[in-house]
């Protein structure tokens, strides 16, 4: 381990500002009103406001990574007679399928392949053929490949068929403008350490209050009972059922202030988009090819094919980049040899320029 700080070019955890880190220097009592009412309740209100201006939505914070919240939603939102259609085109859609299977939740997995955009007509046909489906769940920004999925079109289907709509917006909420009411989303799931630019430690769910209120008694887990967590926060003014990750929460409160200072989600989206476009242009100039076509890319993370040169090893490429202060991500695509570069967090145009220079230096197989 080294004391040197790297620029994390990953989809989260990501590079955070010094002020977000410094917010964690304060110790809070989990029973204190200054913390629960002054911090937690403020966060809940701000998250709901970021998601939509429409009435009837609420938010719940939950200890753990984003996957904990995904499992909490699946395990709480679906009753014993319900069935979920899971749209999957990557590791995180597949993870939802695995969760549903382990919890004994009836589900239909529509897997369209890792590099294919979900076919909305195929989803329509599935819904038309199976009236027992009560819920639809999908990932928005699938970081396996960097693909941005059509949550608007699927949301329109969910609304037309009267289905409850669950969206894993882990790597998009706070970085891509959206109105969850207009998108017909009933449950949106995200995490502290993604586009809001906080640190790991908790996830959150922004939900239609009427839907959440109907979840009582559904949960397959004590600690992942979304309804019970929500009622505790509602009835006790921000109190968590079990130990709150206080330092992470304080960091997140600071991160929300910095999001507002940047100009909100629209301004952050613009920065991320420019980062991603500059990255792709620079990588192509160096001879790298993207896994996806441009129209499929999210502004969050990009997958690049590994060089075909027999000398190339990702581990050596990674080491050489890390020596220069940059950390990238290995590939997660099962059918292609790739690596991934994220461009969210405290990453700006100058950082992308510096990264491209470092990559040129690290391309030992071209020497």
Swiss-Prot record:
Pfam families: Aminotran_5
Keyword Transferase: yes
Protein name as catalogued: 2-aminoethylphosphonate--pyruvate transaminase
NCBIfam families (UniProt xref): PhnW-AepZ, PRK13479.1, transamin_PhnW
GO molecular function, one term: 2-aminoethylphosphonate-pyruvate transaminase activity
Provenance organism: Salmonella typhimurium (strain LT2 / SGSC1412 / ATCC 700720)
Gene name of the encoded protein: phnW
Result, substituting residue 168 to A: Loss of enzymatic activity
Cofactor descriptive note: Thr-243 of one partner binds the pyridoxal phosphate moiety of the other.
